[in-house]
Amino acid sequence: MMEDKIIHTPRFDEQRRMRRKKRQRLQLFIFLSIVAIVSLILIYMFTSISYVKKISVNDTSINSTKTIKEKSGIQSNMRIYSLDTKQIVSNIEYLDGVKSVTVRRHFPNTVSINVEEYDVLGVVKDGEHYHPALENGQILHKHNYAEPSEVPLINNFSSKALNQLVKVLRASDTAIINQISEINFIPKVEASHRVQFYMKNGLEVIGDMRTIDNKLNYFPAMASKLKKDSNGRILKPGIIDLEIGAVFIPYESKQAEERRIELEAAMEERSEKDKAELEKSVEKLKKELNQVKKNS
């Protein structure tokens, strides 16, 4: 058998050398790239670059940024890649008024915390202090608000009645809630679910807690039909009675005066009842303390 012969020309040999060099350069580039990437990762992981440098928190109305940062448990000597985000979320969720929490890490050393709080529907007065009442029916007694201006002042509501009020406010338009300055719960024997709203435009709304959520949205239409001066103020303020139907009673009328006397009497009766219940609780506590002293 005749052996095949391969003839190598100078041009062919040169092309082989060029391909070999190109392959070697590519291999060297890949190797150096891997070394560089590994070096950067090691530098990032084991130097101060990966320590938490910044914690950003969104604006909140109940809990301060300082409180949220402290509750998160994040320290400046912690490395960002080792943070337990689930634990951070759990820590912050224990704060009053917190609805949900999201924690994200951002290269190289920033942590962002987004806290969603329950809406503040009103404030409850306790002596000289005002405490926020939330959309979930909770009253935050540990938190003090300044005298209310943007949210209504809520008076004389029991826990059960407050939960009913929350449902009413959540079902109402935000524009209407923003017009309310004060809400009073003034039940009587013949009207055990009566509620009174003082509006910022000088009007007063009376209704039944069980049906007011379907009627309160009528308020803007009724108010718009009343005569106003050049500055937009209502010329003849009065009562919008939504207990049975939807009737406007000017304050100057005899019917409004009778209604006013009835409502004031109901509020006074409610205050006396609350006072009596408080005195009864204090007396009970005194008896329990005396009994403890005797036993000791």
Curated annotation (Swiss-Prot):
Task: Spell out where the chain crosses the membrane.
Answer: 26-46
Q: What residue stretches are annotated with the POTRA domain?
A: 50-118
Q: Which residues lie on this side of the membrane: Cytoplasmic?
A: 1-25
Topological domains, Extracellular:
47-296
Q: What is its main location?
A: membrane
Q: Where in the cell is it found?
A: Cell membrane
UniProt entry keywords in alphabetical sequence: Cell cycle, Cell division, Cell membrane, Membrane, Transmembrane, Transmembrane helix
Q: Which GO terms describe its cellular component?
A: cell division site; plasma membrane
Keyword Transmembrane tagged: yes
Please report the record's description of how this protein sits within the membrane: Single-pass type II membrane protein
Concerning InterPro entries, the annotation shows:
Cell_div_FtsQ/DivIB_C, DivIB, FtsQ_DivIB, POTRA, POTRA_FtsQ_type
Q: Name one GO biological process term.
A: FtsZ-dependent cytokinesis
Q: Does the keyword Transferase apply?
A: no
Q: What does this protein do?
A: Cell division protein that may be involved in stabilizing or promoting the assembly of the division complex.
Which family, according to the similarity comment?
A: Belongs to the FtsQ/DivIB family. DivIB subfamily.
UniProt xrefs under HAMAP family: DivIB (MF_00912)
Q: What is this protein called?
A: Cell division protein DivIB
Organism for this UniProt entry: Macrococcus caseolyticus (strain JCSC5402)
